Regions:
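Active-site loop-to-helix "anion-binding N-cap" substructures in soluble metabolic enzymes
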Residues: 50-480
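Long, low-complexity, highly charged intrinsically disordered regions that are enriched for acidic
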Residues: 5-51
Length: 480
């Protein structure tokens, strides 16, 4: 980011200065200068960037002259299909999310839009049930409705791969305003670089074949546009834009990057991270990275029981205990203390004799512990109050992982009430970002997707971004 260099410089200067030098410096500062110093120190704490050193400020499609140009647009049309009839799409949300970028390109007079996506896991084989033919039909209906006239969407490479001379010729000189949808890019082994053969054996794509496949993509258009945040953490061929002179983001990806930039690059403070999920070991990198950035951290969900057993010796009964994750709990707590991060753990619980609502359900607390034969499936009322208090203090919130088994009504209070708290805070101008995955599912369940600042569409991508990793599909794009 633009602040990255200044943050590094500030961090180095702060680290090099002695206590006496810092005190002498502060004593001679004006109020305005003190405010700037505090800001620099906050930048130093946050690392001044999103992670991996890669900027999240990328060239957007609305900053590119696309009139008369052919646009290759990588989308995410990995839509849910009816199990009995795969030709039926059961939820068009991902198609709807791509429409603003497609419509913008057409309105700005582009020559053609060449859409590309994966669907399912065909593992480098042409699998009929994973054909994008139903997506082409749905896209045509939605684009035509938006335009009030028929907008044909032609599927290229139908029944096979799209890296053919026939497809290349079709895209070479299309009629103005043409919309093409390439057949499932994962039908090609060279897309992911690996897959299975007809006998089910694992195979890898030849490096030269991958290079040729990427070159074939670059022949289809003049400008590369990525609008598939959900696969931005994969260095798959159609995500990288190799061979394109201009590589920009679509509106969906731009929105994701802007939202995470607000949280990770010099956020308003206090910054609160809410982390849930089952295993500590699955979130080690996430926790460690966020401890360098946040002021408060709520640890809930199943992994909270591992923390409580290690730190306080609490009897957790049959609750989830992560043996591997337990090994680094003390290290995490020591880092939190070193970084002055307040860790908020549950102090009471809703427990059940079964993993379900048909067991004996009761409350437990730290003093009583969780009886043998019972497992913690949600946090209790006092924990809910403590979580609400943390949200009330925050100016920026990032949330990844539920507080309990919210799919069951008896164990949803921790997650549902916290969601209500976050929504209320958002009304008060707090920046709130939901980091995809199960928390995004909770947003959908409670109808709060539009009531938080941003609800991410990328589970794995958002997690890796929060872990401080570069996303190949983002790093490949041109800087703004």
């Amino acid at each position: 980011m633009g602040s990255g260099a200044s943050a590094v410089e500030a961090k180095e200067k702060i680290a090099a200065a002695s206590d006496d030098e810092i005190k002498a410096c502060i004593a001679n500062l004006s109020a305005d200068q003190r405010a700037k110093l505090v800001n620099a120190m906050q930048l130093a704490k946050s690392g001044g960037g999103s992670g991996g050193g890669s900027s999240l400020k990328k060239l957007r499609i609305d900053a590119v002259d696309i009139a008369g140009k052919r646009i290759f647009m990588r989308c995410d049309f990995n839509v849910p299909q009816d199990k009995a009839d795969p030709s039926k799409i059961t939820n068009t949300q991902r198609i709807d999310a791509a429409l603003p970028t497609i419509i913008h390109a057409l309105q700005k007079g582009c020559k053609s839009v060449v859409l590309c996506s994966h669907l399912g896991r065909p593992d480098g084989n042409c699998v009929e049930k994973f054909s994008l033919a139903p997506v082409a039909k749905c896209l045509e209906e939605k684009l035509s409705a938006a335009a009030s006239f028929t907008v044909p969407v032609k599927l290229l490479g139908a029944g096979g791969r799209f890296d053919t001379k026939e497809v290349e010729d079709e895209c070479a000189s299309p009629a103005n305003g043409s919309v093409f949808l390439l057949e499932n890019c994962r039908f090609a082994l060279e897309e992911e670089g690996k897959g299975v053969d007809k006998d089910g054996n694992k195979v890898k794509a030849d490096k030269d074949a991958i290079k040729a496949f990427r070159a074939s993509i670059a022949k289809l258009a003049d400008i590369f546009c990525s609008d598939a945040f959900g696969t931005a953490h994969r260095d798959h061929s159609s995500m990288m834009g190799d061979g394109f002179p201009i590589k920009c983001s679509g509106f969906l990806v731009a929105k994701e990057l802007e939202a995470f930039g607000q949280v990770l690059d010099n956020p308003a403070r206090p910054l609160l991270a809410i982390l849930g999920g089952a295993k500590v070991s699955d979130k080690i990198q996430l926790i460690k990275n966020l401890l360098d950035k946040v002021d408060m951290m709520i640890v809930g969900g199943g992994m909270a029981f591992t923390f409580l057993k290690v730190i306080n010796g609490v009897n957790i009964g049959g609750s989830l205990f992560d043996e591997e994750g337990a090994k680094i709990v003390q290290e995490i707590m020591e880092k939190a203390k070193e970084k002055s991060v307040e860790i908020i753990l549950p102090c009471d619980f809703v427990v059940s004799s079964k993993f379900g609502e048909d067991g004996e359900i009761k409350n437990a607390d730290m003093e009583s512990g969780i009886p043998d034969g019972f497992m913690g499936l949600d946090c209790g009322p006092k924990s809910i109050e403590a979580n609400a208090a943390a949200v009330a203090k925050a100016k920026t919130i990032i949330w990844n992982g539920p507080m309990g088994v919210f799919e069951m009504a008896s164990f949803e209070a921790g997650t549902k009430t916290l969601m209500d708290n976050v929504v209320e805070a958002t009304k008060g101008k707090v920046v709130s970002v939901i980091g995809g995955g199960d928390t995004a599912t909770a947003c959908k369940k409670y109808g709060t997707e539009d009531k938080v600042t941003h609800c991410s569409t990328g589970g794995g991508a958002s997690l890796e971004l929060l872990e401080g990793k570069d996303l190949p599909g983002v790093k490949a794009l041109d800087e703004a």
